């Protein structure tokens, strides 16, 4: 029975504080995946309460004589008018989670899963492990390589992550505190202690709290979800995943297609598309009602009873509850309050309005917190390990620290790897310039997503100045590097465009290698100066042809060695003049011919021999013919062979590029596997039962069987062994054959549970009626376990 009208039903307890507050009225709203808020109207005999001391105090609002209520913290307190004895106050009761809505941040989380990120955010606000818990199913939540909170409150960030993953949260209350519960399936929602009967509101007061109004509405929702993404590490793989309705569903084909789907593995994409479809379908069937049962709380299952429409007498998940209470009997005098006069037809007592969904519809929070967008580009500084000036991976990606990042330590853990844009990029060809540690870079974001940064260029600033002072050298275009490690050297290409001083300057700190596969043609319009400070090596593997139109002046400050494999031909227009400081030695293997048109003279030692048109003249102190003696001996030829030049560095040609992936238009839909779950032939015990599907021991998906106890899903490539577990305790093992469509008649009967042999003993004890088979099949372990009779 309800308490008498002159008794107070509602009260407020404030921890560690003595007060005489009485609750005059309250209005509150609480919903799944949202912080609750209760606005309270209070009265007190004291008009001098320390309002500042009341702020942030834990408090418990009691809603019924049985002690049920809502626990939170006082986030607002205000004093109103005073009467002869009572003073009015207004207060707001919210969870500790609400404080996160007042804190905004910009920070980076790396290599953490969503539950781990949520835990860090909560514990950063003093909401420790005893004040929150995760009740998650077997679905794995992979670590996010890079997750950014950007220009959003901590509450919005936490809510967004939950919405993206399909995780919901609700609060559970006690007089000592409130606990934040995260879940991803229906098992995390508790059931209210007792059913609540439906009694149509006829203006009469029931003996017990009841549901006075209850209505159901169906809405059209998307029936199919498709997600697509791109992974630069797997560019040839089309990243697409889809999830659709059960076969045979009578509904229009309404597709929700989105790119990017934010996944790099198809299994992850399939999971996200499944969760997205569940989000669309979560409220396609929705109930709204009104009751005076104060135990109704969002995130709890309501058991409805006594409704004339029998199928509605079932479990309903309360997704939103609006609470309202008034007890004007606490007033012993008139003060300025709307509650004293009442509003509308509600003047005293408690009532609520609620929204609910069927227990079989998986609740997924709607996407109310979109991912923040970065408008335009940002600047950052390239980072790396201590002492390192170039830090990159195999793709030329770098790490940076943004100027808004307060937690970064300017090392190799400040960010994810950022791809670096190039003005040209192909398969083993294009342009590469790795930004170095300490450089300021311009960072863009794919589709404005702060989780997908990439470097688009580098910037100079007052410390990192340009190679040549500006604007004095504004006509110079420069590409200049710095030697690694340690600096002190550089390579440079400089182009000067100033009129009359045009120049291309090249500096190689060490080696210069050229590879020209065909011709090289060089024209020098004026002079050419070559200075080689070491040895010079040249090799011509064919002819060398050279023409000098003026004098050629060659000075050798050491020996000259010339080796000619065949003949040496010299043609001199006027004269040849050779002077040797010591010796000239001519030697021929066969003959030496010296020919002169007019005169030939041999001179040495004061003697000479001259041949001219006048005859042969021999002149010397003594001319001896056949008088013995020996000829002079020359030093001989000792020509040294040249060393071979070293080869220039080689480089390989690039490969053919991978083109865009052609789309298959009108492609036949993916065939589905359909299993009818039944422990016995003809017994549909799994109708509308939640199930979980495992492939080769790994969890893949979950859902609800149809009215006939059947489930359908896309076969997974390479997966042959499936296990299906239903909520009523049954488990089914399925081993796939190579061609599931090519089954013989006996195979199809075997899949339905029939066998082609006669059992020595009955497989089950005969039951008295067909319904008994279904009843026992739906309660494994509860059936008769007596030994069957032959």
UniProtKB/Swiss-Prot annotation:
Gene Ontology CC entries for this record: extracellular region; type VI protein secretion system complex
Phenotype of the disrupted gene, per the record: Deletion leads to a complete loss of PldA, PldB and VgrG4b secretion.
SUPFAM superfamilies: gp5 N-terminal domain-like, Phage fibre proteins, Phage tail proteins
Keyword Phosphoprotein applies: no
Composition bias, Basic and acidic residues: 753-763, 772-790
One example of a Gene Ontology biological process annotation: protein secretion by the type VI secretion system
Pfam families assigned to the protein according to its UniProt record, in alphabetical order: Gp5_trimer_C, Phage_base_V, Phage_GPD
Keyword annotations: Secreted
Keyword Secreted annotated: yes
Region Disordered, residue ranges: 753-790
Subcellular location: Secreted
Similarity-based family: Belongs to the VgrG protein family.
NCBIfam families, alphabetized: vgr_GE (TIGR01646), VI_Rhs_Vgr (TIGR03361)
Function: Part of the H2 type VI secretion system (H2-T6SS) specialized secretion system, which delivers several virulence factors in both prokaryotic and eukaryotic cells during infection. Allows the delivery of the phospholipase effector PldB to target cells where it exerts its toxicity. Also plays a role in VgrG4b and its effector PldA secretion.
Protein name as annotated: Type VI secretion system spike protein VgrG5
């Amino acid at each position: 029975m309800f308490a008498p009208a002159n008794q107070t039903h509602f009260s407020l307890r404030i921890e560690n504080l003595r007060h005489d507050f009485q609750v005059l009225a309250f209005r509150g709203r609480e919903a799944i995946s949202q912080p609750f808020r209760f606005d309270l109207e209070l009265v007190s005999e004291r008009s001098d309460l320390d309002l500042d001391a009341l702020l942030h105090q834990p408090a418990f609002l009691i809603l019924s004589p049985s002690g049920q209520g809502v626990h939170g913290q006082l986030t607002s307190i205000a004093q109103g008018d005073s009467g002869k004895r009572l003073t009015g106050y207004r207060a707001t009761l919210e969870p500790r989670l609400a404080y996160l809505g007042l804190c905004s941040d910009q920070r980076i989380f790396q290599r953490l899963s969503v539950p781990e990120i949520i835990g860090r955010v909560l514990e950063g606000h003093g909401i420790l492990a005893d004040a929150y818990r995760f009740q998650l199913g077997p679905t794995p939540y992979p670590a996010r390589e890079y997750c950014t909170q950007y220009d959003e409150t901590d509450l919005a960030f936490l809510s967004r992550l939950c919405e993206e993953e399909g995780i919901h949260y609700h609060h559970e209350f006690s007089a000592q505190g409130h606990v934040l519960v995260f879940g991803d399936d229906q098992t995390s929602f508790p059931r209210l202690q007792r059913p609540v009967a439906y009694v149509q509101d006829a203006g009469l007061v029931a003996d017990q709290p009841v549901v006075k109004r209850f209505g159901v509405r169906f809405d059209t929702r998307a029936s199919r979800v498709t997600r697509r993404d791109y992974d630069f590490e797997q560019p040839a793989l089309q990243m697409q995943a889809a999830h659709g309705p059960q076969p045979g569903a009578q509904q229009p084909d309404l597709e929700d297609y989105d790119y990017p789907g934010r996944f790099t593995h198809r299994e992850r994409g399939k999971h996200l598309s499944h969760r997205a479809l569940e989000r669309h379908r979560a409220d396609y069937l929705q109930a709204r009602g009104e009751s005076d049962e104060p135990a109704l709380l969002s995130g709890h299952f309501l058991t409805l009873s006594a409704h004339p429409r029998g199928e509605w007498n079932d479990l309903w998940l309360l997704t939103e509850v609006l609470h309202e209470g008034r007890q004007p009997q606490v007033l012993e005098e008139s003060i300025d309050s709307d509650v004293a006069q009442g509003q509308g037809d509600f003047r005293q007592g408690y009532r609520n309005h609620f929204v609910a969904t069927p227990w079989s519809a998986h609740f997924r929070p709607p996407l109310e917190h979109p991912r923040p967008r970065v408008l335009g580009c940002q600047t950052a500084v390239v980072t790396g390990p201590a002492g390192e000036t170039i830090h990159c991976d195999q793709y030329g990606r770098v790490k940076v620290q943004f100027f808004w990042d307060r937690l970064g330590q300017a090392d190799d853990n400040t960010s994810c790897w950022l791809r670096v844009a190039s003005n040209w990029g192909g398969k083993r060809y294009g342009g590469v310039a790795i930004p170095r540690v300490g450089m300021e870079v311009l960072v863009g974001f794919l589709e404005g997503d702060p989780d997908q940064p990439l470097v688009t260029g580098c910037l100079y600033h007052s410390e990192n100045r340009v190679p040549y002072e500006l604007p004095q050298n504004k006509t110079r275009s420069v590409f200049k590097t710095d030697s690694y490690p340690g600096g002190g050297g550089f390579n440079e290409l400089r182009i000067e465009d100033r009129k009359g001083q045009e120049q291309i300057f090249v500096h190689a700190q060490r080696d210069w290698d050229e590879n020209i596969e065909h011709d090289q043609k060089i024209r020098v319009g004026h002079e050419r100066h070559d200075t080689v400070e070491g040895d010079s090596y040249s090799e011509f593997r064919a002819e060398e042809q050279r023409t000098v139109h003026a004098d050629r002046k060659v000075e050798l400050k050491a020996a000259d060695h010339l080796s000619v494999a065949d003949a040496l031909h010299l043609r001199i227009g006027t004269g040849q003049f050779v002077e040797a400081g010591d010796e000239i030695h001519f030697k021929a293997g066969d003959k030496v011919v010296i020919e002169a048109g007019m005169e030939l003279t041999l001179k040495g030692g004061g003697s000479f021999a001259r041949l001219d048109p006048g005859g042969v003249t021999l002149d010397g102190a003594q001319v001896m013919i056949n008088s013995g003696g020996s000829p002079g001996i020359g030093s001989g030829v000792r020509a040294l062979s040249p060393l071979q030049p070293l080869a220039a560095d080689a480089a390989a040609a690039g490969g053919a590029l991978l083109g865009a992936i052609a789309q298959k238009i009108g492609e036949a839909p993916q065939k589905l596997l359909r299993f009818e779950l039944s422990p016995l032939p003809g017994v549909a015990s799994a109708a509308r039962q939640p199930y979980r599907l495992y492939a080769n021991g790994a969890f893949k998906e979950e859902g609800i069987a149809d009215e006939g106890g059947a489930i359908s899903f896309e076969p997974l490539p390479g997966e042959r062994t499936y296990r299906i577990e239903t909520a009523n305790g049954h488990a089914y093992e399925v081993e796939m054959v190579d061609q599931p469509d090519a089954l013989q008649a006996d195979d199809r009967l075997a899949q339905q549970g029939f066998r082609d042999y006669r059992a020595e003993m009955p497989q089950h004890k005969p039951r008295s009626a067909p319904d008994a088979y279904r009843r026992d099949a739906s309660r494994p372990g509860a059936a008769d376990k007596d030994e069957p009779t032959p």
